[in-house]
């Protein structure tokens, strides 16, 4: 698999994926994206993993987006395939049943920000800079940026963001709802792991169904969304974890969930 992507499982239920090309600002090469896809697919079918953290090596860059040194050598038809590779990777990340936290350790630009947008939650260091600068290169965001960003921060803000290609600081990103938390660099991973641990402590079937209901519900009208919510709720009723939650409440102890 090479070392462009690092993958570890921490504390049994927490997966950590690290983009590991610091010499290239963790830019997304084709090899790196294929490796990332393999890891995402491995996580998808591992019911023991309850939460995922995605971060980058170093303090300068989370991910600079597409590898432009690689891109400049491509023919026109190859460029589209290169963009599609990033888009498919982001889609796989978005579709994971487990919640994914982007721990943005530095600049997140272009396809790098689009990967973060495919995550459920985003935490950024104070020094991070975020942007979709593609229009400045006479192209557009092609890995979900034009679709996920307006769903997250609203149509008007997303249009300004993409049309101008301007970059925002971590604090401004928090103000507009692009990230949930901003930390000092030394606190980034502790905060991400704290959040992942809080998620992992809850009923894993319930968390997966909550993610499913939220994501699918946002794609449709309210009435259909409420029906999706009810179907998701039904999945939790016959579980042993639901009974464990009630028993733990009655006995005034912390519930121990097993995902069954």
From Swiss-Prot:
UniProt GO molecular function: lyase activity
Cross-referenced Gene3D superfamilies: 2-enoyl-CoA Hydratase, Chain A, domain 1, Lyase 2-enoyl-coa Hydratase, Chain A, domain 2
SUPFAM superfamilies in UniProt: ClpP/crotonase
Keywords: Lyase
Source taxon at top rank: Bacteria
Keyword Lyase (UniProt): yes
GO biological process: fatty acid beta-oxidation
Name of the featured protein: Putative enoyl-CoA hydratase/isomerase YngF
Family from the record: Belongs to the enoyl-CoA hydratase/isomerase family.
CDD domains tied to this protein: crotonase-like (cd06558)
Keyword DNA repair: no
